[in-house]
């Protein structure tokens, strides 16, 4: 195997969207084109050729392991594609954010009837912060939706990113006729036996169809006043190519996939703590753990550490360094994923995602290196929690299991832990309600420690430098606490309480995480 050639083939990306925008459907269609499934909704076992319903798709019903980001891999057109799926709204957690740290590009799926929605905006901010390319798929053209020009305007006004349409819809809903493909300079037809037609045939095909006339006017306007196409701007995350289509009817998806694979970047390097970038083509293996997934099925008490390979090649049985602990580990039981099936893997290269069976060795953010290399990658960002719960052990006799459970689950990144400065009470912070449910379930199931959880509601969180701290600054409207690293932090009741504090203590600098 020529390692350099293999790395060049890799395309690793995440799909982000608001719930119900069609992310699951487009994921299924991409897997269908990759030959992994026979039809959307059925996943093919690689070895047996049997077919199974892809239960990982039904995110809302399954509050178990499948709500966490799945990793799927397939080959298409000479490329090895790694898709990282990110859970939707109800199942939103820091997992989703961290997944975006392990990809080289993002595909943003937007419901063309609704435009940019809250969750899309949140996820886009994380992607923008990383400076990676974003490709936009305006979905559901088989239904009536908003005007295409309005949708482009929203990308610029709400997300602050310039856009360039790769194709343009001819009508929508019941009047949907197809796409005017600006990139390939052809027509993609929604109805009839022919899939494509030349632009010259447009007038003959559509006659005086008012929607086609509108398309020609829109394109003239875009040519005069729209953004210029620039591959450089796409790769810098400054320009998003926009594709229109319908994932449900599998229209426009294959064209999107082919153009996406042409412009999506090959694996990126990753920054070390000293600021130096590790090149993906370095021969020495390195990677980082971006999530740990513990199975919620009590029959399989396994934990899997998801590792993004940054450089070199993984080979089964290899020994690695874990610089955080100064110890080593052997990577013998390693998997790659296809929906709910796991395949043992013997080798993988930079850009790939592997799952390492974990007996408690790894933490989220850990760096893996080989040989004399003992460097660490930059830490993964900490995300500011939005909702809080007080937590205590239900049974005083179970304090030991309670503390062990909390320590391990916090290390794993399941929730964030805070301690009330004055009372020593434990408080948990999360970005989504599901994190608390998973925490409670696992404390009881895995650590035999029942917990009492009391909602504290939403809080606005700000860190304060220890030298600026005076305990008298605390009040009922801004609780003073310590995070798990013993750094002081205020939990403000709301934005008004934060502004009041800032006015009262103008010289005190408060810090916000992502």
UniProtKB/Swiss-Prot annotation:
BP term (GO), one: regulation of translational termination
Lineage: superkingdom: Bacteria
Residue span, tr-type G domain: 8-268
Any GO molecular function: translation release factor activity, codon specific
Similarity remark: Belongs to the TRAFAC class translation factor GTPase superfamily. Classic translation factor GTPase family. PrfC subfamily.
NCBIfam families: prfC, PRK00741.1, small_GTP
Name by which UniProt lists this protein: Peptide chain release factor 3
Organism of provenance: Streptococcus pneumoniae (strain 70585)
């Amino acid at each position: 195997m020529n390692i350099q050639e293999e790395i060049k083939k890799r395309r690793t990306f995440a799909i982000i969207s608001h719930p119900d925008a069609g992310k699951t459907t487009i994921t299924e269609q991409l897997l269908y084109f990759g030959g992994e499934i026979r039809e959307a909704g059925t996943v093919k076992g690689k070895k047996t050729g049997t077919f199974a319903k892809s239960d990982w798709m039904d995110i809302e019903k399954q509050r178990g392991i499948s709500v966490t980001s799945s990793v799927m891999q397939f080959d298409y057109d000479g490329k090895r594609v790694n898709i990282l799926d990110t859970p939707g709204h109800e199942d939103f957690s820091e997992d989703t954010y961290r997944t975006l740290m392990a990809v080289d590009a993002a595909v943003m799926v937007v419901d063309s009837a609704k435009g940019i929605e809250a969750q899309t905006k949140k996820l886009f901010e994380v992607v923008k912060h990383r400076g990676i390319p974003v490709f936009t798929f305006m979905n559901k053209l088989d239904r009536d939706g908003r005007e295409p020009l309005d949708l482009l305007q929203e990308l610029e006004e709400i997300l602050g990113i310039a856009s360039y349409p790769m194709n343009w819809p001819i009508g929508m809903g019941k009047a949907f006729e197809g796409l005017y493909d600006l990139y390939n300079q052809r027509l993609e037809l929604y109805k009839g036996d022919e899939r494509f037609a030349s632009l010259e045939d447009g007038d003959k095909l559509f006659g005086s169809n008012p929607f086609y006339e509108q398309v020609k006017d829109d394109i003239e306007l875009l040519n005069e006043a729209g953004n210029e196409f620039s591959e450089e701007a796409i790769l810098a995350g400054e320009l998003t190519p926009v594709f229109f289509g319908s994932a449900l009817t599998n229209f426009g998806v294959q064209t999107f996939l082919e153009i996406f694979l042409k412009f999506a970047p090959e694996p990126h390097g990753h920054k070390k703590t000293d600021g130096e970038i590790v090149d993906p083509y370095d021969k020495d293996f390195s990677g980082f753990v971006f999530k740990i997934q513990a199975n919620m099925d009590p029959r399989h008490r396994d934990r899997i550490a998801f590792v993004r390979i940054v450089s070199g090649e993984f080979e089964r049985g290899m020994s690695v360094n874990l610089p955080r602990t100064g110890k080593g580990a052997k990577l013998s039981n390693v998997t790659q994923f296809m929906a709910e099936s796991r395949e043992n893997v013997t080798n993988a290269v930079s850009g790939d995602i592997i799952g390492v069976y974990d007996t408690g060795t790894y933490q989220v953010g850990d760096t893996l290196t080989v040989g004399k290399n003992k460097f660490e990658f930059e830490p993964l960002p900490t995300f500011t929690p939005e909702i809080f719960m007080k937590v205590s052990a239900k049974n005083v006799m179970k304090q030991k299991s309670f503390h062990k459970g909390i320590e391990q689950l916090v290390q794993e990144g399941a929730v964030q832990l805070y301690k009330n400065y004055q009372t020593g009470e434990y408080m948990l912070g999360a970005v989504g309600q599901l994190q608390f449910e998973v925490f409670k379930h696992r404390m009881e199931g895995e650590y035999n420690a029942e917990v009492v959880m009391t909602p504290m509601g939403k809080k606005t969180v700000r860190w304060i430098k220890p030298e600026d701290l005076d305990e008298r600054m605390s009040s009922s409207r801004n609780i003073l606490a310590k995070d798990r690293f013993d750094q002081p932090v205020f939990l403000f009741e709301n934005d008004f309480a934060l502004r009041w504090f800032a006015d009262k203590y103008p010289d005190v600098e408060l810090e916000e995480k992502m």
